[in-house]
Amino acid sequence: MRKTYGSLLPGMKPAELGGKLIAIEGTDGAGRTTQINLIKPWLEELGHAVLDTGMTRSCLAGDGIRRAKEGNNVGRVTQSLFYATDFIDRLENEIVPALRAGFVVLTDRYIYSLMARAIVRGVDPIWIRSIYSAALRPDAVFYLHVDVDQLIPRVAFSRGFDYWESGMDLYPAHDMYEAFRNYQSALLREFARLGLEYGFETLDASPDAETVFSVLRPRILRVLQSTAQPEFPARQAAESDLAARPSAAAGPPVAIGFPRTTEPLAIPANSSIFASLLAARTDLETAIKSLSRNATTTSNGNTRSGAGATIQPNALIPPSVA
């Protein structure tokens, strides 16, 4: 039976999700999108129905994230909540329905990229894991590894260095080249840790795309033929750490509403982090709309949020985390 990393979304019945969920992970420039563009038509030729999805493609939050990042002034907690909203919206409205219909779902990045980016920026690892506790466990996670010295020319000669992908918010005194090297090196270290915890299948993505694809094909066929969900023993340690973390006094389960559904989700009263995320979803929808309405342009051409677009992240997070 399909599993999550914690709580189920309201109305989700794991036994009904008969499709396959395959995550392609890796840093910027590793070739994830290229591989998905090769995998999808190949699977369709084999007779599989395929959905591909990826970060910031949510109709609800994707455009808001892009607008918010234009001003280069999004805080790390606010950014994490934006990405979580994008993910939960795609999970509820794209991934789950596709799996229910028997599709193969290919996702360009999954929660691991989102967690790695947040952790490198100093976000509490236990908190960020709890935000994504409703995520479905993929049937396979293929991590495309390329060292930083190979990433640099790939990015430089394709689309160039980007403020956020270069980690300029972390290394403001560095030039973009040095910031990119430092940030991507930190991400590679975090991916190595997450790979051990979540059971990544690591592939050397330094060869050309066709060579990497030839390595992926038999592994994907193996996943499609398997009926078992992978187990990640290292995950138990993180879950135990979360359970042992000091929190507010426990109480009876609290039923909270979830947008676009009439079914309640029972969450223990001391699971305040995940409950806060779900309860904050409406506030984030409003914030995204405000960002669009209140965007202003600075003298150097950058876009930044107006006063009406301010998000108060600490109102959504328990005092022990904020």
Tell what function each PLM region has:
Residues 290-292, 299-301, 305-308:
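Intrinsically disordered, low-complexity segments enriched in small polar residues
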Residues 38-47:
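A short, Lys/Arg-enriched amphipathic alpha-helix followed by its capping loop at the start of a domain
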Residues 2-15, 40, 156-259, 265, ...:
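NTP-dependent small-molecule kinase module
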Residues 46-136:
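ATP-dependent small-molecule kinase phosphotransfer cores
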Residues 21-24, 104, 141:
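Hydrophobic "anchor" residues on beta-strands that sit immediately upstream
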Residues 57-59, 111-112, 146-152, 209:
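Conserved nucleotide-binding/hydrolysis micro-motifs of P-loop NTPases
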Residues 14-39:
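Walker A (P-loop) phosphate-binding motif
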Residues 114, 119-186:
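A glycine- and Lys/Arg-enriched "phosphate-lid" helix/loop adjacent to the NTP-binding pocket
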